[in-house]
């Protein structure tokens, strides 16, 4: 028997959430064929502070690329295609409740790049998240009691080849609505353009709770509007900046109609900044 040697190198990993409980390291050769994987436990992951972690990994000989996946187990069938033996990780999916505190993240790196001690591997959450606040200086007569996301994808892929450009959808996907209105950060699987929308539940002028529909569209340079894809690893921070009357009287009415006239919001994405989204049935909803 020949027991192959292992090459040791240090990988500094960075995530945008709070904790890495375990790390799965997958090895692929120059032709993207699967070579093997190992799992690193929490005890072997060194927290360097500032959302930076350091681990030592054993790299199988002939490895050209490492894929790193946090906080979930990866099966052999997810790691490699049965017939070709090549990387199948881009087809691996997860569904169900999302964990903001210990998120499933993915990243990849060329082994040659690890020869530099300064190399960092960036890990990306497989989901997006949204939150809602109001501008207290501009909005005095509006109490937000919660919000819900509608028609977001029910599942998502672990890895992606479209990180900065578009969503990576599973081969088949259903869409779902959140069950309850609440505040805080709501995680959701990345969703293609033209699908998802938000309903904010709030009290206007100390009146009863009413419902405001907010869609997601991007304003183009020519003034037209295009539905906006909601991408993984983005935080869509919605801030209400103006309200001039109550919303729809029921959730169903809000769902069945265009965004209600009179609610203006600013949306700040934790990657690029997008502003001046106006929820209004008299105009196209957009961001600019």
Spans of features found by a protein language model:
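Broad, structure-driven detector of short, well-ordered beta-strand segments within folded domains
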Residues: 238-240
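Intrinsically disordered, low-complexity repeat and linker tracts
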Residues: 242-287
């Amino acid at each position: 028997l020949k027991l192959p040697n292992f090459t040791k190198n240090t990988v500094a990993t960075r995530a945008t959430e709070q904790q890495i409980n375990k790390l799965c390291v997958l090895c692929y050769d120059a032709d993207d064929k699967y070579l093997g994987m190992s799992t690193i436990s929490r005890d072997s992951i060194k927290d360097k502070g500032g959302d930076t972690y350091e681990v030592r990994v054993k790299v199988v000989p002939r490895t050209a690329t490492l894929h790193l996946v946090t906080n979930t187990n990866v099966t052999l069938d997810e790691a490699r295609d049965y017939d070709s033996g090549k990387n199948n990780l881009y087809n691996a999916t997860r569904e169900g409740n999302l964990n903001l505190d210990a998120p499933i993240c993915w990243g990849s790196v060329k082994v040659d790049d690890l020869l530099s001690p300064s190399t960092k591997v960036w890990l990306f959450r497989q989901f997006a998240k949204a939150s809602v606040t109001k501008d207290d200086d501009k909005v005095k007569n509006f109490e937000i009691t919660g919000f819900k996301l509608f028609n977001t994808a029910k599942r998502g892929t672990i890895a992606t080849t479209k990180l900065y450009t578009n969503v990576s959808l599973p081969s088949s996907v259903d869409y779902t609505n959140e069950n309850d209105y609440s505040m805080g950060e709501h995680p959701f699987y990345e969703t293609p353009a033209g699908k998802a929308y938000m309903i904010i539940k709030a009290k206007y002028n100390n009146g009863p709770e009413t419902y405001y529909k907010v869609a997601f569209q991007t304003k183009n340079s020519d003034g037209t509007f295009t539905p906006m894809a909601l991408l993984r690893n983005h935080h869509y921070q919605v801030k209400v900046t103006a309200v001039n009357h109550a919303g729809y009287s029921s959730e169903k009415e809000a769902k069945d109609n265009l965004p209600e006239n009179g609610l203006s919001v600013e949306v700040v994405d934790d990657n690029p900044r997008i502003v001046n989204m106006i929820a209004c049935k008299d105009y196209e909803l957009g961001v600019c």
